[in-house]
Amino acid sequence: MKYAVVGFGTAGYHAVKKIRELDKEGCIDVYSNTERAPYNPMLTTYYAFGKLEYEGMFPFGDLEQIQKEVDFNLRKEMVIKVHGSEHLVETENGSEQYDRILIATGARAFAPSVKGLEPEDAFLMRTVEDALRFKDRLKKNDIKHAVVIGASMAGIKVVEVLHKYGIETWLLDLAPHIFPLAAYPEVSAEIEKRVEAQGVHLKFGATIDHMEQEDGQKIAVLTDGSRIPADIVGLCIGTRAITDPVKDEVAIVRGITVNDHMETSVPGVYAAGDC
């Protein structure tokens, strides 16, 4: 039996371990175009905060350790398309056929376009690269004011990091309260009190419309007309499933749809994780 796993994050890692546990002889090819071992995106803020060493973002060990523990082939190739009905994985270097294919491509942070926001002042928090870039900027000690868009779990962790560095911080969201998808309003109200007690500014029902300069200071102009000084902007507005390799092959509703066996609309093609 030949297996292909497209993507090597947490879902891909656990899938490879389970496949090898159930099939000692089958060929497992893992497609990943990153040099990094699988990591947990939620741990990136802990690294930026200084609560976690770099290695702590990789709970399963480095690639060498993982390959010693589990027998599989790591193919560092970009997957262009998965031809579902043909069970074919097409990469930049050619194509190969498999009996079973798992799509575990994950998700990417959503980065809306903000007029006037310079790329060097815009920060996401999803990948290891995001965490390294954010930490490097904080070390420059040139940030006095920050705005974070998105009152989410990731958003509040970024706010916590900024607050630790003594940076005046605003947390914005179009929703009426913090954690709009995860908490009841009365719970959110209590959390908001505690966040504000730490000196963080909260503003709901508004977001950034565009950026301006005023007397040398970068200003975030909000959709309600408010003006907030903002040397940097954190974009924590959620994620979007990475479905590019299968977008024309399987059923997708915001993400790849699966049945109770994690099988997509194409027999023999499965999906797991944030995709």
Name each model feature, range by range:
Residues 76-86, 204-216:
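A conserved short coil-to-beta-strand element within the FAD-binding core of flavoproteins
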Residues 1-71, 153, 159-182:
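Beta1-alpha1 glycine-rich phosphate/pyrophosphate-binding loop at the start
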Residues 118-139, 227-275:
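FAD-site-proximal beta/loop scaffold in flavoenzymes
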Residues 2, 76, 140-145, 205:
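Phosphate-coordination loops involved in phosphoryl transfer and adenosine-cofactor binding
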Residues 105-165, 258-260:
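Glycine-rich dinucleotide-binding loop and its adjacent helix/turn
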Residues 145-146, 153-210:
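Rossmann-like dinucleotide-binding cores of NAD(P)H-dependent redox enzymes
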Residues 6, 96-106, 228-238:
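Short hydrophobic core segments
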Residues 91-94, 223-225:
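Glycine-centered tight beta-turn/hairpin loop motif at sheet-sheet or coil-to-beta transitions
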